[in-house]
Amino acid sequence: MTNLAAILFGLVLGAVFSIANLVASRIAPLAEDTPGALLLFYGPMFAAWAVAGLMSSRRTTRIGDCAKAGALVALVTFLVLTAVVIARVNFLLDITSQRPDWQNLMVRYRSSGFSSLRAYANYVYFTGAPFKLLVASSIGALCGLLGGCSSILWGARRPVG
């Protein structure tokens, strides 16, 4: 998988998962992020990152390239998703602030010294974004590595071009 293909794949995944996030927020705006809901959301995402590694292994025997493909796809996916989540929080702040998983954020806001919940929420989301991008890229690298290894181990590697 070329870098351009990885970026495009990440953009598509970011758009798909962002739409899923927005639809879920519209259908059940106060739903908690339960372990089952998180698995249902992130499981397919991680599988797609593994596919990036698998596709990369079809072009090269270097397993590091599979991890790089997974990491790049994950980074771009999460850049898009993070931007959409921040926009969603801003557009739906009144309802989002009532979510059970926001109660800790609301307690921290009250003692933060910020005069605006919107400003505080943006501060929290923007300062947390680099760590989330790092974690997503690391998980993407691992998924890409696993996808590449599975392809190589089961002989699915076919040179392209």
Residue ranges of predicted features:
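Cytosolic juxtamembrane helix and N-cap/initiation of the first transmembrane helix
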Residues: 1-13, 144-160
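Loop-to-transmembrane helix junctions at the membrane interface
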Residues: 56-80, 84
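Functional transmembrane-helix hotspots
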Residues: 81-109
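Alpha-helical transmembrane segments of multi-pass membrane proteins, especially transporters
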Residues: 6-13, 65-74, 136
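Cytoplasmic membrane-interface segments at the C-terminal ends of transmembrane helices
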Residues: 50-66, 148-161
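Hydrophobic alpha-helical transmembrane segments
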Residues: 109-144
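Transmembrane alpha-helical insertion/packing segments
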Residues: 1-55
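Alpha-helical transmembrane segments of multipass membrane proteins
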Residues: 13, 17-21, 45, 77-81, ...
